Amino acid sequence: MAQRKTNGSKLFMMVLYMVAACSAIPISDLLDRASQRSDTLHSLSTTLTQDLDSHFPPMGRVITPRPSMCHTSSLHTPIDKEQALQVSEADLLSLVRSLLQAWRDPLVILSTSANTLPHPAQNSISTKVQELLEHTKSLGDGLDILSGKFGPAAQSISSLPYRGGNDISQDRISRLTNFHFLMSCFRRDSHKIDSFLKVLRCRAAKLQPEMC
């Protein structure tokens, strides 16, 4: 299964590199493939959050930081589809790329921490986080290439540094709580990434707004 996913990521990148050399494939088709990958990201992050919820200490719910504490919260993004439709395609792609870039380091930390997470489903969680890491990198690299077709605005990336350090804590409750919080933040952002890419796909296909 892992080998198949890795091969899929390599194929996704190979197609985009080919398109960078020759514009043989319509942008709408490339965005369709990107939105399929973002859908996988969001589904996987949702499953991971549910796995963590199944064994989350009551105290953890009390001390979990608010969503506004997520390191990407400072990025101003559309709150719904109607707002997203008002944003230019280049700016929307820039938002997606900024969110993906912001999660490269935190996902590495989550992947490392998952290896020793005090949770009954630790092995499954560790495998899924590694898949998230690979999918996120593949999608980000692909959109980096695709951004060249949308102009300078799409190539701009907002800096959203993660300042949580390289360790999510030592004691059991804090470790589970911090891991859960980071995963919840990623799930929220993966929903934005998926939604924005679907809007971009819709607009590239020149569908009516009500069809998006």
UniProtKB/Swiss-Prot annotation:
Tissues of expression: Pituitary gland.
Top-level taxon: Eukaryota
Compartment list: Secreted
Signal peptide annotation: 1-24
Annotated keywords: Disulfide bond, Hormone, Secreted, Signal
GO biological process, one term: response to nutrient levels
S-S bonds: C70-C185, C202-C212
InterPro entries attached to this UniProt entry: 4_helix_cytokine-like_core, Somatotropin/Prolactin, Somatotropin_CS
GO cellular component, one term: extracellular space
Entry GO MF terms: hormone activity
SUPFAM superfamilies per UniProt: 4-helical cytokines
Keyword Disulfide bond: yes
Entry similarity comment: Belongs to the somatotropin/prolactin family.
This protein's name: Prolactin
